[in-house]
Amino acid sequence: MEDGKRERWPTLMERLCSDGFAFPQYPIKPYHLKRIHRAVLHGNLEKLKYLLLTYYDANKRDRKERTALHLACATGQPEMVHLLVSRRCELNLCDREDRTPLIKAVQLRQEACATLLLQNGANPNITDFFGRTALHYAVYNEDTSMIEKLLSHGTNIEECSKCEYQPLLFAVSRRKVKMVEFLLKKKANVNAIDYLGRSALIHAVTLGEKDIVILLLQHNIDVLSRDAFRKIAGDYAIEAKNRVIFDLIYEYERKRYEDLPINSNPVSSQKQPALKATSGKEDSISNIATEIKDGQKSGTVSSQKQPALKDTSDKDDSVSNTATEIKDEQKSGTVLPAVEQCLNRSLYRPDAVAQPVTENEFSLESEIISKLYIPKRKIISPRSIKDVLPPVEEAVDRCLYLLDRFAQPVTKDKFALESENISEPYFTNRRTISQQSAENLDAACGIDKTENGNMFEDQNVDKEGKALPATGQKANVSPEQPPLFTHTVKDRDHISTRFLGGMDSLTSSEESSERPPLSTLTLKEADPSSKAAMRRKDSPPPGKVSSQKQPAEKATSDDKDSVSNIATEIKEGPISGTVSSQKQPAEKATSDEKDSVSNIATEIKKGQQSGTVSPQKQSAWKVIFKKKVSLLNIATRIMGGGKSGTVSSQKQPASKATSDKTDSALNIATEIKDGLQCGTVSSQKQPALKATTDEEDSVSNIATEIKDGEKSGTVSSQKQPALKATTDEEDSVSNIATEIKDGEKSGTVSSQKQPALKATTDEKDSVSNIATEIKDGEKSGTVSSQKPPALTATSDEEGSVLSIARENKDGEKSRTVSSRKKPALKATSDEKDSFSNITRGKKDGEISRKVSSQKPPTLKGTSDEEDSVLGIARENKDGEKSRTVSSEKPPGLKASSAEKDSVLNIARGKKDGEKTKRVSSRKKPSLEATSDEKDSFSNITREKKDGEISRKVSSQKPPALKGTSDEEDSVLGIARENKDGEKSRTVSSEKPPGLKATSDEKDSVLNIARGKKDGEKTRTVSSQKPPTLKATSDEEDSVLSIARENKDGEKSRTVSSEKPSGLKATSAEKDSVLNIARGKKYGEKTKRVSSRKKPALKATSDEKDSVLYIAREKKDGEKSRTVSSPKQPALKAICDKEDSVPNMATEKKDEQISGTVSCQKQPALKATSDKKDSVSNIPTEIKDGQQSGTVSSQKQPAWKATSVKKDSVSNIATEIKDGQIRGTVSPQKQSAQKVIFKKKVSLLNIATRITGGWKSGTEYPENLPTLKATIENKNSVLNTATKMKDVQTSTPAEQDLEMASEGEQKRLEEYENNQPQVKNQIHSRDDLDDIIQSSQTVSEDGDSLCCNCKNVILLIDQHEMKCKDCVHLLKIKNTFCLWKRLIKLKDNHCEQLRVKIRKLKNKASVLQKRISEKEEIKSQLKHEILELEKELCSLRFAIQQEKKKRRNVEEVHQKVREKLRITEEQYRIEADVTKPIKPALKSAEVELKTGGNNSNQVSETDEKEDLLHENRLMQDEIARLRLEKDTIKNQNLEKKYLKDFEIVKRKHEDLQKALKRNGETLAKTIACYSGQLAALTDENTTLRSKLEKQRESRQRLETEMQSYHCRLNAARCDHDQSHSSKRDQELAFQGTVDKCRHLQENLNSHVLILSLQLSKAESKSRVLKTELHYTGEALKEKALVFEHVQSELKQKQSQMKDIEKMYKSGYNTMEKCIEKQERFCQLKKQNMLLQQQLDDARNKADNQEKAILNIQARCDARVQNLQAECRKHRLLLEEDNKMLVNELNHSKEKECQYEKEKAEREVAVRQLQQKRDDVLNKGSATKALLDASSRHCTYLENGMQDSRKKLDQMRSQFQEIQDQLTATIRCTKEMEGDTQKLEVEHVMMRKIIKKQDDQIERLEKILQHSSLMLQVFES
């Protein structure tokens, strides 16, 4: 039975390969234990105490690495555990399975022991070999009390290894519902995941456990969690076809999203009311970062509000930055503060069930964005609400209010119908202000006119108590319409809607001009305590926005519009948009209103379209009303079937006795990427009020960053006003820095505004900077317009800007129409003719048109009219055309009129058969009366690249004020960037008007930096304008800068036109500084713009023109330029004024650009005016065959009877430097005043740089007028540049160059020397510390100009007076043509390189996809491997059980057979009993017969008859009795036999059936396993190729073996010589060998007899072998050695021959020596056996005992013992040889001796058997030693094998040695010395071979293990 128990216990490897729960108990064997372990096992407490008192190590381990504490816990002995713990036994030691005593106690449910361990500080978080803690085993055992104790003692409920489940997941995987419920109550992490990302819900779904699923759903588990295979629980439910569980998950998900708007609104807001009739609020900065990876979401919204106190209202509009990052084609939406009662659950859609959206569906949803907010309010219109609601209701019924999972697609027809229904009722069918009085409007809007002008709105109730519709929605409310609900949603309305296609966020925040803003702002007089202006803060990093505002005091209000920052980051297809809008009104005697910025950015990717139409109409009547049309900002971005809409609108009303109506400017930028269209519309409105109005327009900064479809933007605006008696106006500085690095963009915008108030009006025009960059076939168009009106008893109207951007790609169209109309008011009407720009671009049969019309009237006896500036930029690439027209017109007023005709500049560039023409015309007419008309300015630019068209229109209009008008035309900068079919346009216009008294106005610095890498372009436009007024009008014409860059055959044209007009009195103006810094760094850009303006006024104005520093540094083909132009005029009664310094620093690494712009201005007034035009320096850098063109034009008129004008000097510098070019141009101008003005000619610096096929063209025109009774007019300069491919020409400049200054070249050199001083001035500015970081790297060396460029400059300087003829111009043209040809050749080379780069990128993308796929496959394989391992373990266990069943069945079968045999023997016994009865019966019959005969003779006849009759009767009775006996016996026997047979048959049949079933099951299982094994073997074949490398390593080891063999060969050669002599002797002995053959035959017969005896002994040894098998591995092998020595002589002979052949191949010579040595040994041993059997037996016994002792220590010692035995045998063999010589002489005696030897051998065999018995008896005593030596068994095996081989060889060669006895006797003496040496060497070689064999075996095991691992991984 003990053997049976041992078989049940698995080995350590089997236990480790199992699941860890199969064999909880320890296999205990006596010889494994030590003293302390035995005491614990037997429960001998006293002995344990004794051992511990004697300082016995309590932590001592037994042979299975177990401590006494392990055994005490396993056997459940708390007393032992307490004693051991009290003796400070270590509690956290581990056994061979890495299990602590605590784990063992919990596993075996020994709660008392476990509690003792926990109370004494045992660590419950230790994991065992399987990665499980004690908590896992407690869960497995479902022991709740144990779990509670473990948790109470600090067990980590989530502790596990990487490859093991957490306890909760473990309970779910084991289907333990109670444990799952218990753990969830104990706050286990319900969303925990395993190493494959699977949650508990996924496990429960795969197992089909409905109860567990319900439990998990009750604890709010994340049903959208995805595992490593990107699947959720619903997917597994679908795969398992488990409808019940799927319905549970679906119902839970539906309910969760139904409750989301009420319970899960992720918005926190704080409100504090305003105190003491005033309220100031700072809206919070809402930063929403939504990152979704692998289907997970994270959203955060925070909003905080703080009020200010006392008579002041300071409001900071919130800046909402939304950064949405989407990866792995997932979509993320962030829900900002939700509107109450929002859209009946339509806005919150589950992401998991989101379906892709088609193009038609998108077109519907893009319309729904505007619909959601239009109809849900009261419309003050003669038409009923039915005109608006029906289409909206249809759309809502179809899309928004349907269930999330069942939204229906919308067809194109339906979309067309809905788009018409929205635009017409909402925009055209509204009541105008003329049909309503102001009171009615206020009443309808719910405006409460109080002293404080505060409008508080509660939920659905305004301050007046007027009930409002409780819709909970905030819609797009028009100026005539009251809001449906008031501001109750945390002062801001953020709506996030997710449409069908995925998680698209739509945020809209809009207000009407008639109701208070969402933040419930109030408007009141400024408090004197708020005089100090807040300092500007540096622009925050990307993703953050900071805005600061301070209002001015007394009868003025400063209202700032919100800064809407939309940063959208899109990765790999998803899109997310967020919009934040803020609204602020201004009231009481003055109103400051800022027009909202409407930015509509529609980005469509993958064949989807987005169209936005926003028409606006406004009229003015009676008491001038101020009306604002709501701003609709819709940013609809769709990528990868997803949509994201963003809507931002800002509205600010102003009221009380005056109203100003400003139409919105609708800017539509359409971006197309991959056949998609994107539209962006930005409009700004500014009204004029009675009294004075301080108005700051909002800064709308839209930074769109795309990185592989990702966007990121940051906007920072700061506003600061100035106070009293003077007005200082700084236009906002809009800096849009778009950085693209590897397709990524980062934009930062900072703007600061400072208004000045009181009896003066300070008006700031908004700077709308839209930087749109498109990469990979995207287009970006941005249009920004700003308009300031005139104030005080006059009406200023600005004509509408109609920008139509139509882009068609792949048959898709996107149209946007924006119209604005303003009528003329009161006694005067000024009409501006509409400016119509029609741009038609065709690509693939597509047409796009744009129309822009503007009409402004002028007021009161004078009319000032400025036509709109329409810039349409068209770029044609690859056979397309490019034209640019720029015109600017300023009017003159009072007794003089100046009319300027439009300047039409048409630049047409063609590459590959295209032409480029440029026309620049300048016209200046003079007019009488008081009409000044300025014709419209039309710029038509057409850009086509790969069939894509983009247009931009920018118009700016300023009106005249109060008998005088001061107008500054806008600076229109159009920067176009094309990269690989991408286009980017930016239009910026700014207009400041002149105001009462004296006004110093600084125009905003517009810095637009755009950088693209790999075919991307950058442009930056910066303009600054300051006007001054005093009973005179100063006009500055707009500067239109059109930069066109064509890449891959595109051309660059620059047109500059300037027009000055003369007016009365004197005026000083400062022209804007246009700073354009363009840098490229592998697609990265960094731009910083800082502008500071400080005005000073005192009847005089001194102007100092700006210093423009543009420094560009490039590494590896980058350029650096620095241009500075300082101007210092002489003044009388001088008041110095420093204008703002815009510094643009663009730093780039690996092609970085650093630019610094410094602009300083000082004006002076009083009867004299010194006017200097700004120096516009435009450096354009083109990399990778890109072109950049920038044009800056400035116009300044001069008045008072004289006008002096200087023409510009054009300097063309071309620098070529290997990779880096740095140019410095320094123009200085100084003018003198007082009656005579000195006229200076502006510098036109054109720097053309060619580096690797790059072009950069820059033109700088400056016009400076002078005064004093004379007017000089200059004709316009017509510049026509035509570029052809292979033959190109350009005419960059045709200008009148009169009165050239000979000192220009000297000034250039002086400026270069003075440039460091200018830098010091720039660095001294506090506001520029952050911006000038990269400007310090600007090079001041002017010697980098190449000789050719200098020669060109000298030619221009020399011929400046003679440039009217064409000869000189042709010379200049020829120089340009040469350079252009070189550039073109390099462009072609760059194109080829680009193609290669694109191919490489495509390959890289393909490889990345493959890598990702392989990684997924690997993860799947790992998962399958683990499952297969578990299956294999389970199969092994099943096979073992089946084997046990078979054994049991066989035993039963044998028992049945024995019973059958017993029954058969009983039958035989009964048959034997019946046999003797039969003869007795026969003898009785014979006696009867004889008796009858006798009776007849004796008796009489009567008696005879009687007797006969009686006899007959007796015989009959006897016969009957016999028959009865026989029948009874037979019946009994038959019954017995039948019963027995039936029982036996039944048993037999049952056994046969059981056997058949078992056989069938085994066959099935074997077939299944064989199929699996076949599959595994097939996979193994694939892995064999991988093993070749490992085989190579094995071959290396073989080479090492060969090196050892070489050494052996050398030794063998030495031995060959010694053996040669021995061979000769052997030949001599051959004769004697023949004689001995007869003796050999006899010996063979004896050997056969001995072999039989050995076979018998062998059978006995096998029996002993089975017994030794359980004793230990060492004893087994030793027993085998002795068994094989006697049993396998013949087998070993055949094996020896094979071995000899193996050795002969490699060791021919060595083997012969070895054979001889073995022969001698065998002879000696045999002789010893024959003569001294007793001595041999004793020696062997001693040697065996020594060997057993030596096995424990060393294997080498045993080998030496064997050698000692061999030597002793040799001595005995010598004596035997002498006897054998005598035997040869006497054969008869030998025969007798052989017979004796046989008997002796039999005795020897018996002795050996007795010795073995003794050894076995001693084995029990040596078990402990053998266990200790088990670790050395591997080494002993090799030694034993060697000894076996020796013994086999000795016995196999026994016969041969007998034949050669006579020969060996003679040679023994000679060979003894040699043999000893050989033996020593042989032993050494054996050791070496053993070591090598061990190494080889280890390597083979490692290879096998690695191959198995590879197979497992690949399977």
From Swiss-Prot:
Keyword Oxidoreductase tagged: no
Region feature (Disordered): 261-331, 470-619, 639-663, 676-1203, 1285-1304, 1489-1508
Highest taxon listed in the record's lineage: Eukaryota
Transmembrane segments: none
Biased composition regions of type Polar residues, renumbered to the chain: 262-272, 297-306, 597-619, 645-657, 1175-1196
Chain positions of ANK repeats: 31-60, 64-93, 97-126, 130-159, 163-192, 196-225
Positions with biased composition (Basic and acidic residues): 551-562, 585-596, 806-815, 874-883, 931-951, 976-985, 1044-1053, 1100-1121, 1134-1152
Keywords from the UniProt entry: ANK repeat, Coiled coil, Repeat
A Pfam short name: Ank_2
Xref: Gene3D superfamilies: Ankyrin repeat-containing domain
Biased amino acid composition, Low complexity: 505-521
Keyword Coiled coil attributed: yes
Coiled-coil positions: 1383-1466, 1504-1531, 1573-1614, 1727-1814
PANTHER family with a match to the protein in the record: ANKYRIN REPEAT DOMAIN 36-RELATED (PTHR24147), ANKYRIN REPEAT DOMAIN-CONTAINING PROTEIN 36A-RELATED (PTHR24147:SF50)
Family according to the record: Belongs to the ANKRD36 family.
Protein name as annotated: Ankyrin repeat domain-containing protein 36A
Lineage of producing organism: Eukaryota, Metazoa, Chordata, Craniata, Vertebrata
